[in-house]
Design a protein with these regions (language model features):
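N-terminal leader/targeting peptides and immediately adjacent processing regions
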Residues: 1-42
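Core of folded catalytic or high-affinity ligand/protein-binding domains
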Residues: 31, 35-116, 166-168, 172, ...
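Basic, alpha-helical nucleic-acid-binding regions used in initiation and control of genome expression
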Residues: 92-97, 101-242, 246
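Non-Sec secretion/translocation targeting segments of pathogen effectors
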Residues: 256-267
Length: 267
């Protein structure tokens, strides 16, 4: 199976998510991204994941690392990967401008110290598993059984799908205050865990991982309107190479010291 995705379709998916989600909240972004991706046929879902990897890799260069350090008080390999997930979710124009010069990130509404979005880089995995789980629940009679036991909680056709999504994306969120809702969550999680499908994307990707020709074909389209990244060394003085972003971060720090801290906020 070859990945089926174009740069226009990839960024149109991102735009639809941005139009619906709270873009300051990764959990909201993950849910709306999942809802979009679970609709895709498997070749396009594979293509979306490959495109995500490609765009994330293209944004891996020293000056972008410096931008991540300014925004998040430092960085590491994993943290920089998560930062680039956030960058992709800012949309095509912001992404392209950041490739031209990461200092252009200063024009965005940046949630400083909160742009390391690990989860959204994995949503394609969850969406694929979600497709398999929906089929499994239906064929195994689980869907009918849960609707019989929890009719008030599963009134709408998509209520169970949302319950499955919540357990995939946030399996450790706080317990429900209503006993019946907590029981539904417990049962859904049990069926997911015992299905053997929670990590089914790993096998799917291994079996359908694109070869070099397919990667090259995909990336020639994905990168067709993007700038070339110049080879450079890690900058020594971030305030000099990224002056706008540096000033914006300094202003944010100053504002935080003037107001009372939020409950639990680090200073």
């Amino acid at each position: 199976m070859n990945p089926a995705m174009t740069w226009e379709k990839f960024w149109s998916i991102i735009d639809r998510v941005r139009a619906q989600a709270d873009m300051q909240d990764e959990a909201s972004v993950n849910q709306f991204l999942y809802t979009e991706l679970i609709k895709l046929p498997q070749d396009e879902l594979l293509g979306f994941d490959c495109a995500w990897q490609s765009y994330r890799n293209k944004a891996n260069f020293p000056k972008m690392v410096a931008a991540a350090c300014i925004i998040n008080d430092g960085s590491s390999d994993d943290r920089f990967t998560d930062f680039r997930n956030w960058l992709i979710m800012q949309g095509y124009d912001a992404y392209r401008q950041a490739l031209i010069d990461p200092d252009n990130l200063a024009a965005l509404n940046i949630p400083f110290r909160n742009t390391e979005w690990m989860g959204c880089g994995n949503v394609a995995w969850y969406a694929y598993a979600g497709q398999q789980l929906r089929t499994y629940f239906e064929k195994a009679g689980i869907t009918a059984e849960l609707h019989r036991k929890y009719p008030a909680l599963l009134e709408l056709p998509d209520d169970l799908n949302r319950a499955i999504m919540r357990e995939q994306l946030a399996p450790h969120h706080a317990q429900e205050t209503e006993w019946e809702r907590q029981m539904l969550r417990t049962e859904v999680k049990h069926y997911i865990d015992t299905s053997g499908l929670a990590y089914s994307y790993n096998e799917f990707y291994t079996q359908n991982m694109p070869d070099k020709v397919a990667w090259k074909t995909l990336q020639s389209d994905l990168f067709s309107n993007l700038p070339q990244i110049k080879a450079e060394r890690m900058p020594q003085d971030f305030s000099v190479v990224l002056p706008k972003l540096w000033r914006k971060r300094q202003a944010w720090d100053t504002e935080r010291t003037k107001r009372p801290p939020y409950r639990g906020e680090e200073r």
